[in-house]
Amino acid sequence: MQALIKISDKQYLVQKGDTLFVPRQKTDIGGTMEIASMARIDGANTVLNPAETVTAKVLGHVKDDKVVVFKKKRRKRYQSRNGHRQQMTQIEVVSL
C-alpha cells in the first residue's frame, strides 16, 4: 500500500518504512509527525482524500548539498560567488 502526502508544497509517494528528506520541519529529533494523506493507492484501488493520516518519525536535521550561485558582469571585473545549503529534515514513515 502506498500513500501520496504533501509536505511544504511538495508531494511524495511513500510506503511504510521509507526514509525521505523533506524541507526543515519544526519537530524535535525522535518526535513524530502526523501528515494528512492526499491519496491512498492499494493495488488497483485508488482513494482520493481519505480521512487517514501518515505517521512519520523524525530521524534528524541535516543540510542539503551546496548550491553555488555565481554572478559575473563581463568586461567590468565583477564576479561574485556565493554558496547556499538548504536545511532539511530526515523522516521515516512509520505507519500509513
UniProtKB/Swiss-Prot annotation:
GO CC, any one term: cytoplasm
Biased composition (Basic residues): 73-84
Superkingdom in the source lineage: Bacteria
Polar residues composition bias: residue spans: 85-96
PROSITE patterns, per the entry: RIBOSOMAL_L21 (PS01169)
Molecular function GO terms recorded: rRNA binding; structural constituent of ribosome
Keywords, in A-Z order: Ribonucleoprotein, Ribosomal protein, RNA-binding, rRNA-binding
Cytoplasm as UniProt keyword: no
GO biological process entries: translation
Region Disordered, annotated ranges: 73-96
Record note on quaternary structure: Part of the 50S ribosomal subunit. Contacts protein L20.
Family per similarity comment: Belongs to the bacterial ribosomal protein bL21 family.
Its biological purpose: This protein binds to 23S rRNA in the presence of protein L20.
Name of the protein: Large ribosomal subunit protein bL21
Gene behind the chain: rplU
